[in-house]
Amino acid sequence: MSDNRPTYDTSSSDEEPSNHFHIQLPQRQLNLQEIRKQNHKKHEKPTIAKQTASNLAKAKKITTGSNHKFGNSINNNNNNANKHLGSSSAGTNRRSLISPTSSTHVSSDDDDDDDDNAAFYGDKLNDNKKLNVFADTKNNLSHFQFNADGIKPKSLHGQGDDSSDDDGNNLDEVEDETHSDFAVLNQNHPPQQYYETDSSDEDEEDDDEVPQTVHKTYSNASSGRSSRLSRKKSMSETTDTRAPIPPTGRRSTNSNHSRESSGRRSTSSGNINSGGGLKGILRKMSLVDSTPVDSTNQDISHSDTFLGRVLNFGTNQGLSGGGLAPGASRVIREEDEGEWNLDEERRVGFAAHENDRDAFEMQPLNYEDLSEEAKQLIQQHVPGAGASNLDHSQQSSAAPSTEITPSQSPNQHLLNEKSNNNENNQQSTTVESSSSTSSPGEDEELARRRASEERKKAENPFYTPNPDLFLRGTNADNQELHQAPNDFLHDMDGDYIAPPKQVQAGVLSSLLRLYQNPQEQKSASSLSRVSTGTSGTALSSFDDSYDSDDYKDSKSSSNVDLQHKLKSGIKGGSKAMFNKAANKLKHHSHTRTNTVETQGSSNSEEFSNDKDEFSNGYDDDNKMNANLPSFQNARPKMPKKKTTEPVQKLKKLRHKQRAERLRITVHIADILQRQRFIMNMCRALMLFGAPTHRLEEYMVMTSRVLEIDGQFIYFPGCMLVSFGDAATRTSEVHLVRCAQGINLSKLADTHKIYKAVIHDLIGVEDASKKLDDLLKSKSRYPPWLCVLFYGLGSLAVTPFAFEGGWLDLPISFGVGLCVGYLQFYVSSISNLYSSVFEVSAAIVVAFIARGIGSIKGGDLFCFSAIAQGSLAIILPGYIILCGSLELQSRNLVAGAVRMFYAVIYSLFLGFGITLGAALYGWIDHNATSANSCASGHAIDEKWRILFVPMFALCLGLINQARWSQVPIMIVIAGIGYIGSFFAGKHFSTVTEFTACIGAFIVGVLGNLYSRIWKGMAVSAMLPAIFVQVPSGIASKSSLISGLNTADQITNKSSSNNGGTVTNDASSLSFGATMVEVSIGISVGLFAAALIIYPFGKKRTGLFAL
């Protein structure tokens, strides 16, 4: 060993490009205090002090070594390495080439390294020469990380036996690295954990040197240290000019000075399985270590393994992109070419050009591309599966099952799956709320579900094909009545139900099935009377499928005996006695059979199974305990023999027949209940004043939901209902007749029940019960309160419609009470009087009004205002509304009947007024004959609008409306009156145009209320139409036009012919006025429908419930 101190000449690395020693970049100062504490904790043995002293002496000699021998040492070292370059394998384990005694040989390079690695830091070393050495040569060696701040101890992967293989030159590296200049290090250099020492390169180099350096002098070790030092300085000089690199493994770190290292180093990175404790470090995060690692004392969070990077994921030392790309290869440098054929791993992050660094870098996952590829694969292998949706416990999605894009929310999927199920259950029925648009995949899935349900119904004997589809051919009519599915207004109402392909079988066909069962004609005795030979043959053939050939004869004979006994039991005994005897015979038969089987041949399958199951062979015990309760025979050893086959057949046949009868009976009861519900629904809608133009549609939708073959046709006052039976080509016709009335609260309740049924929210039984309770329930307001409302309504309508004065209001209130009493008390008592109620009421009103109006010559009260105001509530406003809606929906029969009835009704009222005025004229010859109020008698126009809300409120309460329904009625009625009032100022002589403008405003508001707030437009529009009718009539005062006729009657005109002509003209004048008003209201409602539903939504039926 030389005493000369070496000078650290960096020219050796430039002159020797084949130098194969590696060194790490230091980045931290030595944290001596921490290292001393750790070392003292781990090594508390007496031998440590001796080893420390010897190693400190060795370190002193190293630092005072000679300088002139470095050149020769380097040359010798290099020559030795080059000689054995080809002979030594890169993958050879270093320990297999080292002598067992080499760890104590001073002149060996490996001995020096091992001894130096077993040493501690001395207390008297200089600051630039402090060493970090661990002292257990047979145990695991510590590993250090260098950076600008300090050095942290790092435990190696390998332990125990691999201690001699890990970093044999650790002492030399530590000594040289402590003399490095840290000022030249780049601040952007990758952190310390990516420059941890990987012993794969040193080990492979040492493997080549082992045959020459095992017995070398220490000068070779010193020359190795100097060469590594020169290489390290050259690396530090090139650090400033190097671009920042991503954090990678040890292989990437050495690539910057790859042109100064040996060509063999390019092969060392490919040999992952070579020896060394640190070969488990992942290179560029994606290389996997294949050598077993003992990580007992390893700090995973600070290691360079995959787990360490995962634990440090949040820092700049964690996982990053890059790594060895799939399909990449490592190519050894061709020295003849003079340039590097860099492998892909090295080219990713350390290429010379910026554009080449990402050639094989792993990119983030593109989920859209993955989704498309998955769809293509699924469609290629499983056609049609790409459009299906998976059913999840909360699923619901508009996306197909192959969609894997993370942006697709499972909740939305779940919300969309639920909407699909609703559409499936309701057969394209939409709920009140807006529904999302379904994708083509959902449509296909929905179509498949419908097809499966239709197939199940087709196989069910209680379903028959819908005659509307194959027999009557009403598809075209359905398309005419209902809008096409692709219309954007299709889902607004939610009442449309597609006609089902299968409907419930009719009652008659079910009865025929019930009473024409051919098996019913056979008695029990005829089924049990079979010959012995036949039964024996049948039973023996049955036994052949279960019994073996060894004991088939004995079993068949016993079965024949059992059959004889059963037959006698069937003939002679009762059913209870027969069952008891059959069970007893069955028990004895099984006992005898088991005894024979136990004593019989042991090669049979039954005996072997019995022996294997119980594995004791207690034959005698089985015989003795045959009559005792035991669980050994609870499990049958073979299928039970049908020893009582005739009886079993008889029982099964009876059970099957009974079950079939029960099914048919339940089916008939269900059909009758559904038909009864449909008729009750029809009766309720007619009684409570549903819009008559939609009654047929309500019934059709209800029958479709209930799967009943029903046909309906409506005439005013009656509904023809036909329930068909396609199997027998018969139909059952019902006629539902009832007096049509108005009850807005019960109409709303009926509408709710109807909605619940068509959306399958409640069953038919519950709906029938609720409907029956609703039909039996009393009215919301008692009759005496309705009479009061009549009086208030008459009081309110007099000022704004007929120009009544303040003094006319109490008179109108009193006369209105009389009209209310006649309607709610007298008319309800006698059906005969209800037929002449309008005429009688008009007579009473005209008589009282003319008598009061004649006071003081007609200057105090206005006869026309009192008479018309008192009769305004019974004017045919609702009849005109229903008639115009029916004409608009092309229901010509009902519409024409109602409109003509409104005209006739008006003629009745006119005739009553004429008769009442004539009666008072006979009494008082000085009775007033004024057809209108005097000027200045009416209330100021600015106060008239205040009575409109009061009139609308009274109309609503008279028609049994809820208080919650009143506000919208008042709003629509008030706005409609304002429009008709100002229209009447300009078109005073044109009654039709005035009524048309008012009805148009009312229709627009009613349709908006129905479309936006999902309310009942008919109930909201009814008071407003009642306001429009009196206003139109009052414009010509045609209601009291019969007053002239009354005067002629009382004055007894001599011109009979002329009087007759005058009488005819006066009688028809009020009817003509009602026709004009009806036409104006109908045209206004048509125009409103055109504005709100510009594409003509026919299926909605204007002003839908």
Curated annotation (Swiss-Prot):
Record's bilayer topology term: Multi-pass membrane protein
Upper classification of the organism: Eukaryota, Fungi, Dikarya, Ascomycota, Saccharomycotina
Compositional bias annotation for Basic and acidic residues: 446-459
Family (UniProt): Belongs to the ThrE exporter (TC 2.A.79) family.
Stated name of the protein: Pheromone-regulated membrane protein 10
Biased composition (Low complexity): 67-82, 417-439
Membrane-spanning ranges: 782-802, 809-829, 835-855, 860-880, 903-923, 938-958, 963-983, 986-1006, 1015-1035, 1075-1095
Subcellular compartments: Membrane
Compositionally biased region (Polar residues): 1-11, 85-106, 185-197, 390-413, 520-539, 592-606, 624-633
A GO term from the CC aspect: membrane
Segments of skewed composition (Acidic residues): 162-178, 198-210
Highest taxon listed in the record's lineage: Eukaryota
Region Disordered, annotated ranges: 1-22, 36-55, 65-123, 151-278, 385-473, 520-656
Entries under PANTHER family matching the protein: PHEROMONE-REGULATED MEMBRANE PROTEIN 10 (PTHR31082:SF4)
Gene Ontology MF terms in the entry: transmembrane transporter activity
UniProt keywords, alphabetically: Membrane, Transmembrane, Transmembrane helix
